[in-house]
Curated annotation (Swiss-Prot):
GO biological process terms held by the UniProt record: cerebellum development; negative regulation of cell population proliferation; negative regulation of G1/S transition of mitotic cell cycle; neuron projection morphogenesis; phosphatidylinositol 3-kinase/protein kinase B signal transduction
Complex and partners: Binds PPP1CA and/or PPP1CC. Binds F-actin in an ATP-sensitive manner. Interacts with ACOT9, ARHGAP26 and PIK3R2. Interacts with components of the WAVE1 complex, CYFIP1 and NCKAP1; this interaction mediates PI3K-WAVE1 association and actin cytoskeleton remodeling. Interacts with KIRREL3.
Descriptive protein name: Unconventional myosin-XVI
Positions with biased composition (Pro residues): 1585-1633, 1710-1719
Length: 1912
């Protein structure tokens, strides 16, 4: 059964113990079972003989390691003699010397060093033996290694040297510091050495990145540079890597991120940095651990947990929006409750040991009946906090007075000083300045001058005194705070005075002000300081006759401030010389420590019973000073203070159980004092008299009773392997009893101080902060009693030392420096006799304390030896300050006889001390027996207290390294690599070159090791430590005066106060500050402190020497009274304030100048950015304008090229049509009749192929809802099938210059449609591909790229021809009228020569050829209706264009279905019609997908029949033959409608798609649409809305039935050419339709165009009263109503201006290309066409020259003409012509003619007359831009001129010559021009060729005049 230890630790105590017991039982059971199984397997065959022992052989390496650990020195020597290798390595990679350093085995360490073991060997963590010795604080090993030549500067894996692991104050630390100082290594040099490694990596990384290296490059293990820097704590390297894009979440091969490594190795600053840069805290490594799971400290773990929560919230809110993260976000984590277990020991006890201790603790409480009901262990005790009375509602401060500064008094003497102080004391003005020294008189009452409001009033930006505020402690603290950052050195506030003068309270107020004004979290630090002071007051203060709360120790507070942010980052308290003798014996009238009084009055009866303190006053330690007349108010106050103490202990980390344990230890201390000894034998051997009490004490201490009794009464020593036992006498046993109590209390007090320090230490990364300290020293005051003993001597000598330091700093140093610098000093001060007194006691080796330590080293010295030695010292001393009481101060003998007393002349007076018992009180070290017993205590706290070591000053050494607690030394030494790397990188050499090689004798002499642990030695080292700290900073003195000895408020004792003023030297201080020079900075310090002031005042004289620069600054500041020394400036104290004021004024002026300049620069920068932006906008506009110009030029060239190509093509095709017509008319009719019901084929290929639509003759023969179109009307013959009697073409009309040229015959045929029912047919709707339709559209159709298979057709009705190779479908042979039957079959099952319907089917995506051309087919609206009258619907006269879907057959052989979906429900039919796809003869193969047919051209009237567009046959004589011949024409006289067709830009090399199924509009997963035939494609995502119907024209009159087809088609021949060149890109959005929601206007890519002239035409159509109108649909919206679809699109101003220039250059152009509606008369297109046909002349004529040009290129064309003869009759109405020679009348005809022009054998049923010559090429919308429809180019005007020429042959010749020059690259075209052929006669007017090709041998002399018809 295995359970994780973390789980056990998280369980409650009782549950964990039960679980542990169960686990133990199961383990034992499993062990027995395993043994039984093992015995059964062995079979018990081999029994061990009795008496024969089994031996296990271990290796020598294992044995020697075990012997070193257990200090078996003889065994180690024996193993080395047997051959054990002294160089054996342990498992961690270290040597045996590492083990010796770990377990403090000095003897074996010396042996190993003698045998050559490397003292600098490093283990796998780069720890040398010196590192381990310092970490374990083994000074003997440290000294041995140093003497052996160990390198004290070796760095481990974390970059730490051994000194970093030596706890401050330990002997190991002292040895290392002394050695480094002896060899010339200071602390700054150590810091530079530690920075070598990170600076080296920083340099390498910079070089690597500058050379183009990858910041995220990984090594073989996947580790990046960021991983390495985060693990090592190199903050600067991490910042550099992050700036260059380092991957925060990069993982190595073990899935460890940089955040994992920073958390694991305790890099708190880097953890903050990574989290601030959005590192993911949720990533896990290969072990499934997040960074918070492996955090090295609780602060890092809490930080990471907080980051995880923030990350989750950020992901929930907005995953894409990163939140701002700063390092300050993680600085608010409070650590008010640190774990106590982390402070107990460096080596944490295992959980089994902790459980064992807890079990025994429970047993202990059970046996002693335990404690009564207590508060919950988890919650803090309920306390009633003491409300502070120092926060009044209103604050009234006394106004400033002239006597605020005593240094300004006119009369200086003792009486005047005393008078001013008394007067101020009477006015409650207890604060007074003496220059920079502060004088405080204790009022013995609370004054409302220490509130938070007052503290805020004294906040100053410069630290100078405010003239409007009286003197105050806060002002002194404010000055120290500002001096801290001005001088950038520590500041020390020293409080001195007698006991009860108010030093402790003054220090509290100073700390309160500093923490509140400079704390990042004021409430947190105020609370911590309050609780820390409460604990310190309880355990370190006592009630005396001079003070109710008298300090019994020296306190030195250190407040750490961040140098950059200027707020408190932590604090630490150092305590010295605790009055431990006060615990066991109090002077008369004084009490013990306050904690015992609080326990007596604050504990309840039950609690006292549990602690065995029912009779509290009966204990000896408290009975001496306990008063019986304690008032009830005082008892109540003590109870409240105890409650405050419990709360304070909870705050700093003690749980309720631990507080209970703490009180139990205090109770044990009191019970120890009650143990008495008695002598049962004559040898006076001591025995414990009360064994029950001893057992009770042992239970409370949780030690063995026998061991405790033996340790108290005997002394066991080991000498050369022998054990020596000595019995103590009762006196010695009592001495060790009291020493045990004092030691336990002292160590407990040290433990509490360390815990407080841990609580006050900020959790910020101390190593990364540059900190400065403000120290506050509070020493116990001078005291004198009737009987002064050794304790009073130590207290008064401490005050003597501090007074001497003040005199030395204030007087002696100034006097010495004045002499050295040659400055005259106005006043002189006598040094006094303090130096002689201090030398008498502290001088070595002849001082009194040295003699006392010698006597204390004896096991038990004889008392009379010390008086004798003291007498000899007094006689030999040269000072009169210390003398024997037998003599008076003048040396006269007072009395005879030797006595153990002497008199000392202190600075405060004469005091006589008795030395009786001084030796015993000086001893402060327990016997080894007592130490061993206390170390083995089952109480965790007691065991820890005695396992910890003591510092030389007697303080308990903390378990934490020294660098955990700032301080000046730690800020220099222990700023880790993660700190800011500032400073010069000094390349230090090896240790041998760095350290000065000196003899070890001097070093050993300076070590002064071996000092005994005595009170005198602790006092000496404490004073030395305090003095060293004070000398590092600038002092600020506060003199505290006690007004009376009775502690009464308002009482001023003149004599008592005058005595204090005299020995404090207040008068001397006043004179010093008035006449002396208290401020004496060096020249460099002066210039550095006032650098802004000096840099401005010096001007050009900055290069002068420092002395001259200081002189100039002082002169220009107009200061007087200063003096210049040789190296220093001597200033008066008020001159510092004046310089500070000038510096502040100058700083304000500088800030103002910088503000103005920065604002100016910012504005300039903004203007520059705006200018750059404007330039960019201008450049973009210029680029777009130039691009538009180039596009227009290209358009002009393409129009000319395209028109010429089409003209030649029409000429060639015209000849073929007429030749095939006369030759194959009869054959076509016969074949058409035979193949009416034949199987139709549909095929698909990657390259578009010609398509054919089955004839709808059967549907037209019967009753149909669809009227024949105008195409059919004008192509119908009579029943005999003879051609139309009109043989001559209509007369040539006059041309309008605005009419766009086009050679397309479809533009003409689009206007020649008529219906059967002339009464209900609107004749004015343009065809979708006509020029009018394109002109109407804002986005013209794009010109598709020409394909060799492109064919032209102007009708939907029939496409005849043989099945080409690769066809994949057949058309069903039998189908119902009105339906379209399609049968799918494999290509090999198709018949060869059958009429077919080749449909270009969609293939899967990827099967299409990018060069494929689109084939457009328009589906008939009502053709699928089998029957019905023409009056079934109001839409009977209109053709409804609907979407068609092909529904797959279920089983693969069933009929498919093409479903028509209405495109415009609001305007047209709502019914859905389907075309059944019937199965044919071949095998049926189902389609994969259902194909939708979007309505490409919706809402067309029946006279606008659907259009089938096939790729045209290109002409190679044009270099731009890839351009579409479907040039849009601008027919001004046709009423036009609007559609929502969108024409996307075609990419180069791809097939143009249909407008609704372009590549730009298709989805990512949509199937590719058919390049040419949208019928079988999927549904469009954009379905264009319906177009409102235009105003109808006059209805045509039907005449004649349809004719039968005639003429067989010839076989195809000739290879097609390859197209080239991309089509122009379309531009401009289509307008929204009326009656529907307007479509969003897509902005053009680059160009915008003016409004279409179609608006003019439409408006004209509505206002023309000459035309007959048909009634519009009721649901139709007005054409030009509010929702009119003719929306004005955005246009380009530049393009409009350019059009005006071009219009001016054209002789035929009107003033504006966009004429208003009334600019031209409106006429019917039928009237225009009738005038043309009635003219009798050929509009377009053939050109033999053009034919030769094409024939020279080897073209072979095949033209099959098949038509059907239908009876027809026509009526011609002639009206006046417009200026374009267009007739306004309408030519009506009811004869239906079927003229089929077939290409490649595909019969095409055409609804136009063969002779009209108005064949029109279908306009493709893919390649045309909007400006192609709206603008007239210059080249177009050229073609207009050629068309209007009277001599057409001459015009044609001019056109061909011009075209050849531009387009032809062949060399044979010149010869073709020399042999023109005669012009062929025009075809009959009743026949219209739709697809024209050049016939073999045809003449190309002239193009057909019909192709030049400009009426369309």
């Amino acid at each position: 059964m295995e359970i994780d230890q973390c789980l056990l630790e998280s369980l409650p105590l009782g549950q964990r113990q039960r679980l542990v017991r169960r686990m133990r039982c199961e383990q034992i059971k499993a062990y027995y079972e395993r043994e039984k199984v093992f015995q059964k397997q062995e079979g018990l065959l081999k029994r061990i003989k009795p008496g024969k022992s089994q031996k296990v052989r271990f290796g020598l390496a294992d044995m020697i390691q075990d012997a070193i650990i257990h200090h078996h020195d003889k065994e180690v020597l024996q193993l080395l003699k047997e051959g054990a290798d002294p160089h054996t390595l342990v498992s961690s990679g270290g040597s045996l010397l590492h083990l010796c350093a770990r377990y403090d085995n000095v003897f074996i360490a010396e042996v190993l060093i003698d045998r050559g073991v490397n003292v600098n060997h490093q283990d796998e963590d780069f720890w040398a033996p010196m590192h381990i010795a310092c970490a374990c604080d083994n000074p003997d090993i440290v000294l041995l290694l140093i003497l052996a030549g160990a390198n004290v500067l070796l760095q481990d894996v974390n970059g730490n040297i051994p000194l970093d692991y030596a706890v401050e104050g330990t002997e190991s630390s002292a040895i290392l510091l002394a050695y480094l100082d002896e060899n010339g290594v200071d602390l700054n040099s150590l810091r530079q050495i530690k920075l070598q490694r990170p600076l080296s990596m920083l340099t390498d990384v910079r070089h690597f990145l500058s050379s183009g290296g990858d910041v995220n490059e990984k090594n073989d293990d996947g580790v990046t540079l960021l991983h390495m820097a985060c693990a090592s704590g190199y903050k600067e390297v991490v910042l550099l890597l992050l700036e260059h894009g380092g991957d925060l979440n990069g993982m190595d091969d073990g899935y460890w991120t940089p955040l994992h490594l920073a958390a694991k190795y305790g890099q708190t600053t880097l953890v903050k940095l990574l989290l601030a840069h959005q590192a993911n805290p949720h990533l896990v490594n290969c072990n499934g651990e997040k960074p918070s799971d492996i955090a090295a400290s609780e602060s890092i773990e809490e930080m990471l947990l907080k980051a995880e929560i923030a990350w989750e919230e950020r992901m929930k809110e907005s995953p894409s929006v990163p939140s701002l993260a700063q390092e300050e976000l993680y600085e608010e984590i409070l650590h008010d409750l640190p774990e106590l277990s982390s402070k107990l020991s460096p080596l944490v006890l295992p959980i089994a040991k902790q459980d064992s201790l807890l079990e025994k603790d429970i047993m202990f409480k059970d046996t002693t009946k335990g404690l009564c009901n207590q508060e919950s262990q988890d919650g803090p005790p309920e306390t009633s906090m003491v409300s502070s009375s120092s926060k009044p509602e209103q604050v009234q401060l006394t106004p400033p007075a002239p006597s605020d500064d005593l240094a300004t008094l006119s009369e200086l003497n003792d009486s005047s000083l005393l008078y001013e102080i008394q007067k101020r004391f009477g006015n409650d003005q207890i604060h007074t300045f003496i220059g920079d020294i502060f004088l405080l008189v204790n009022p013995f009452k609370e004054l409302p001058i220490y509130s938070t409001v007052v503290s805020q009033m004294y906040l100053s930006p410069t630290g100078q005194r405010s003239p409007s505020l009286p003197p105050h402690l806060f002002s002194c603290a404010e000055r120290a705070f500002h001096r801290l950052f001005q001088e950038r050195r520590p500041q020390n506030i020293i409080l001195s005075g007698e006991r009860g003068s108010g030093k402790t309270q003054a220090s509290k107020q100073i700390m309160k002000h500093l923490t509140s004004r400079a704390s990042s979290s004021c409430t947190m630090f105020d609370s911590r300081f309050k609780h820390a002071i409460c604990i310190l007051e309880a355990f370190g203060h006592a009630k005396t006759t001079l003070n109710n709360v008298s300090s019994c120790l020296i306190q030195y507070w250190e407040l750490q401030f961040c140098q950059r942010r200027k707020h408190v980052t932590g604090a630490r308290i150092s305590t010295y010389m605790l009055e431990k003798p006060r615990l066991v014996a109090q002077p008369p009238g004084q009490g013990s420590f306050l904690i015992f009084s609080w326990l007596m009055d604050g504990l309840s009866a039950e609690e006292k019973c549990g602690l065995h303190l029912s009779n509290f006053c009966a204990h000896r330690y408290v009975s001496q000073g306990m008063r019986e007349d304690v008032s009830t108010a005082e008892r109540s106050l003590n109870k409240e203070r105890l409650a405050d103490l419990k709360h304070a202990l909870n705050v700093i980390g003690f749980s309720a159980l631990e507080v209970e344990n703490l009180f139990a230890i205090l109770s044990a201390i009191l019970h120890i004092g009650d143990i008495q000894f008695t002598a049962l034998t004559e040898a006076d051997s001591a025995f414990v008299s009360d064994l029950q009490l001893l057992e009770q004490v042992a239970d409370m201490l949780q030690v063995s009773t026998d061991e405790l009794a033996s340790a108290l009464t005997t002394d066991i020593q080991y000498f050369k392997g022998d054990v020596i036992i000595r019995r103590h006498t009762t006196q010695i046993a009592a001495f060790y009893r009291d020493l045990l109590a004092k030691s336990l209390y002292s160590r407990l007090f040290g433990f509490l101080i360390n815990t407080v320090n841990c609580c006050l230490q900020s959790q910020d990364e101390y190593k990364s902060l540059q900190t400065l300290d403000i120290g506050i020293l509070d020493i116990f005051g001078f005291e004198e009693f009737q009987k002064n003993e050794f304790e009073q001597l130590c207290v008064n000598l401490t005050n003597e030392k501090m007074h001497h330091y003040i005199q030395e700093v204030l007087f002696l140093q100034e006097q010495t420096e004045c002499v050295q610098e040659g400055v005259a000093m106005e006043t002189a001060c006598s040094p006094g006799n303090q130096a002689g007194v201090l030398d008498f006691f502290f001088q070595k080796p002849s001082g009194f304390f040295s003699l006392l330590d010698e006597e204390s080293q004896a096991i038990w010295s004889v008392e009379p030896n010390l008086p004798r030695k003291l007498q000899g010292l007094l006689e030999s001393s040269n000072t009169n300050a210390v003398y024997s009481p037998m003599k008076d101060g003048n040396g006269n003998v007072a009395f005879k006889g030797q006595g153990a007393a002497f008199t000392v002349m202190h600075y405060a007076g004469r005091v006589t001390y008795e030395i009786r018992g001084a030796v015993e009180r000086n001893k402060d070290s327990l016997s080894q027996n007592l130490l061993f017993v206390m170390k083995t205590s089952e109480n965790v706290v007691i065991s820890h207290l005695f396992q910890s070591k003591l510092s030389p000053t007697g303080s308990l050494i903390s378990s934490y390294p020294s660098f955990k607690f700032g301080g000046h030394k730690s800020s220099l030494l222990s700023k880790r690599i993660a700190s800011s790397m500032v400073g010069v990188n000094k390349n230090y050499l090896e240790l041998s070159k760095l350290l000065k090689k000196k003899g070890t004798c001097t070093f050993l002499q300076r070590l002064e090791r071996g000092d005994p642990a005595t009170t005198a030695s602790q006092l000496t080292k404490s004073l030395a430590d305090i003095t060293a700290k004070l000398q590092k900073g600038s002092p600020h003195f506060i003199l505290c005066v006690k007004p009376n000895t009775s502690q009464l408020p308002g009482v001023f004792d003149h004599f008592y106060v005058s005595a204090q003023l005299q020995y404090l030297g207040v008068l001397g201080l006043v004179r010093l500050f008035r006449y002396g020079y208290p401020v004496r900075p060096s020249f460099e310090d002066f210039l550095s402190r006032y650098e802004p002031l000096a840099s401005v005042l010096l001007g050009e004289k900055k290069g002068q020497p420092a002395e001259e620069r200081c002189r100039l600054v002082l002169q220009r500041c107009k200061l007087q009274g200063w003096q210049m020394g040789v190296h220093k400036v001597f200033l008066k104290y008020w001159q510092v304030d004046q310089l500070g004021d000038l510096w502040l004024q100058m700083q304000r002026k500088i800030v103002t100048c910088q503000k103005v300049i920065r604002g100016f620069l910012a504005r300039q920068h903004l203007l520059q950015r705006m200018s750059i932006k404007q330039q960019e906008v201008t450049s973009i506009k210029s680029f777009l304008q130039s691009t538009e110009d180039m596009a227009l030029k290209t358009y002009d060239a393409l129009v000319i090229q395209n028109a010429s190509d089409i003209a030649r093509e029409h000429d060639r095709l015209r000849k073929e049509v007429h030749a095939a017509y006369h030759r194959n008319r009869q054959e076509e009719g016969t074949k058409r009749a035979e193949d009416q019901g034949g199987c139709r084929h549909a095929h698909s290929n990657s390259v578009p192929v010609p398509m054919a639509v089955d004839s709808l003759a059967q549907a037209l023969a019967g009753p149909s809802s669809r009227s024949p179109s105008l195409h059919s009307v004008f192509s119908m013959d009579d029943s005999t099938g003879l051609p139309s009697p009109r043989k001559q073409p209509p007369p040539k009309p006059k041309r309008d210059p605005n009419t766009r040229l086009s050679a397309s015959y479809e533009a003409v045929s689009a206007c020649l449609s008529a219906t059967k029912d002339a009464a209900s047919e609107a004749l004015t709707r343009p065809r979708p591909h006509s020029d009018d339709y394109s002109t109407m559209k804002k986005i013209p159709p794009r010109k598709p790229k020409r394909s060799p298979h492109t064919k032209l057709s102007g009708s939907y009705e029939e496409i005849w021809g043989p099945r080409p190779s690769g066809t994949m479908g057949q058309v069903g042979k039998h189908h119902a009228p009105g339906t379209l039957g399609v049968q799918w079959a494999s290509p090999d099952s198709m018949p060869q020569c059958t009429p077919q319907l080749p449909l270009h089917l969609p293939l899967p995506q990827g099967d299409y050829d990018d060069d494929g051309e689109p084939v457009y087919i328009e589906m008939v609206g009502n053709a699928a209706r089998a029957g019905g009258s023409e009056t079934d619907s109001p839409d009977q006269g209109e053709s409804v264009y609907e979407e068609m879907k092909y529904v797959l057959p279920e089983e693969g052989c069933g009929p498919g279905m093409l479903t028509f979906l209405p495109a415009s429900p609001p305007l047209f039919l709502e019914t859905r019609k389907a075309i059944i796809l019937e199965a044919g003869e071949g095998s049926c193969q189902p389609l994969k997908d259902t194909c939708d047919i979007p309505p490409p051209f919706p809402n067309l009237l029946p006279h606008r029949p659907p259009l089938l567009v096939f790729p045209p046959t290109p002409v190679t004589c044009s270099p731009a033959s890839d351009e579409s011949p479907l040039t849009p024409l601008e027919v001004k006289k046709l009423p036009v409608l609007e559609t929502n067709l969108k024409y996307p830009v075609q990419s180069e090399g791809s097939s143009p798609l249909s407008p609704q199924y372009s590549k730009a509009q298709k989805g990512e997963n949509d199937q590719l649409t058919s390049p040419g035939f949208p019928v079988f494609n999927g549904p469009s995502r954009i379905s264009p809305p319906a177009t409102p119907p235009p105003p109808p024209g006059p209805p045509p009159a039907p005449c004649g039935p349809p004719s039968a087809p005639c003429g067989p088609p010839p076989a195809p021949c000739g290879p097609p050419p390859v197209p080239c060149g991309p089509p122009p890109a379309p531009c401009g959005p289509p307008p929204a339709p009326c009656g529907a929601a307007p479509a969003p206007c897509r902005p053009p890519t680059h160009f915008a165009f003016p409004p279409d002239s179609v608006l003019v035409t439409a408006a004209k159509a509505l206002t023309n009263s000459d035309l007959p109108r048909t009634q519009p649909k009721p649901s139709s919206a007005p054409v030009l109503g509010p929702c009119s679809p003719f929306v004005k699109a955005p246009y380009s101003p530049g393009r409009t201006a350019r059009a005006d220039l071009r219009k001016a250059s054209s002789t035929f152009s009107p003033p504006s290309p966009y004429s208003p509606p009334n600019s031209r008369p409106l006429s019917s297109p039928l009237d225009e066409l009738a005038s043309l046909f009635n003219s009798g002349r050929s509009v377009l004529r053939r050109s033999a020259v053009g034919r030769r040009i094409r024939e020279a290129e080897g073209f072979e064309t095949n033209m099959n003409l098949s038509s059907r003869d239908e009876p027809s009759s026509s009526e011609m109405a002639s009206e006046t012509q417009d200026r374009n020679a267009n007739n306004h009348g309408t030519q009506l005809s009811s004869s239906l003619s079927s003229v089929v022009a077939a290409e490649n054998g595909n019969p095409v049923t055409n609804g136009l007359a063969e002779d009209d010559g108005c064949s029109r090429l279908c306009l493709s919308g893919m390649g045309t831009s909007s400006f192609q429809r709206h603008r007239e180019s210059h080249t177009t005007q050229v073609i207009h001129q050629l068309r209007l020429s009277e001599n057409e042959s001459v015009a044609l010749q001019e056109l061909l010559d011009w075209r050849r020059k531009l387009c032809e690259s062949r060399e044979g075209w010149q010869e073709a021009m020399q042999h023109p052929e005669p012009r062929a006669p025009p075809p009959p007017p009743c026949k219209k060729p739709t697809l024209l090709k050049k016939p073999e041998g045809g003449s190309c002399t002239r193009l057909s005049s019909q192709l030049w018809d400009s009426s369309i």
